[in-house]
Amino acid sequence: MSLDINHIALHQLIKRDEQNLELVLRDSLLEPTETVVEMVAELHRVYSAKNKAYGLFSEESELAQTLRLQRQGEEDFLAFSRAATGRLRDELAKYPFADGGFVLFCHYRYLAVEYLLVAVLSNLSSMRVNENLDINPTHYLDINHADIVARIDLTEWETNPESTRYLTFLKGRVGRKVADFFMDFLGASEGLNAKAQNRGLLQAVDDFTAEAQLDKAERQNVRQQVYSYCNEQLQAGEEIELESLSKELAGVSEVSFTEFAAEKGYELEESFPADRSTLRQLTKFAGSGGGLTINFDAMLLGERIFWDPATDTLTIKGTPPNLRDQLQRRTSGGN
């Protein structure tokens, strides 16, 4: 992985009681040792693979103002990180879920793009076996489950300040207002809505195939084609490019997909991030509620699975063997 660290700072927030978060600040930056680079590379990999929300700085953002000064050389990175950690502590203290943790600020370059990554990481306890086959306690940073993370694409921010996607952050776990306090700390508002873009794409694809008067099998083949392209982009960490997708769909209609989408006013960006959960709807139907969970391939609708909208009834012909076995045992009085 071609990742180069410019500056990296680490501080700590310790929760002493329900009201107070103690601030522990380093007096120097971390050295970019091999271990440190490996840790940042892992954090970059994990973060890049997760679904993120997109944002942009408000005009009043204190973090943006101090970051701009730091980028101009008017403040060093350590001082910037120490002041920002203090503001993060003040913001976190407003919320009852504040647990503290290690606060990481890392300015790094990956594939010619400069980033500033800000994360609050937890230290977890575990066990390890040493060379004598003894079991000893150990601690590790829980990078895989970090949910208080934001990343600023410094290159995009400085070259295209009107962009709505240079800042990304994780939404956090359900029931925790992680996004709320982090947006307040960053002084940012939500920008590009990736889910809305993906939903718009799905609607455009359905309308495109309908206008081309394709039969059911042909429509499903197009959906599978779109899903395959989008999933490849997702796996590669690339965005969905409308022009590239349109070339994939050449021959479906006399009108190109990009022309169709522009003419019909779907307001799709030229490129946007893929959203895994939304894209699954191209090939599957899924839903849950009231103790019922259903998931099936879209091609089965109208063949083995039938929906009557008048009665809201789903009829399934031919159940999976393991489900059928459970039903037979239960109805025959078995366990």
Curated annotation (Swiss-Prot):
GO molecular function: double-stranded DNA binding; single-stranded RNA binding
Top-rank taxon: Bacteria
Signal peptide segment: none
KW Repressor (keyword) present: no
Subcellular location: Cytoplasm, Nucleoid
Keyword annotations from UniProtKB, A to Z: Cytoplasm
Pfam families noted in UniProt: NA37 (PF04245)
Record flagged with keyword Repeat: no
Regions annotated as coiled coil: none
First-listed, main subcellular location of the protein, grouped into a coarse class: cytoplasm
GO cellular component, one term: bacterial nucleoid
NCBIfam families: PRK00378.1
Family, similarity comment: Belongs to the YejK family.
Descriptive protein name: Nucleoid-associated protein YejK
Source organism (scientific name): Shigella flexneri
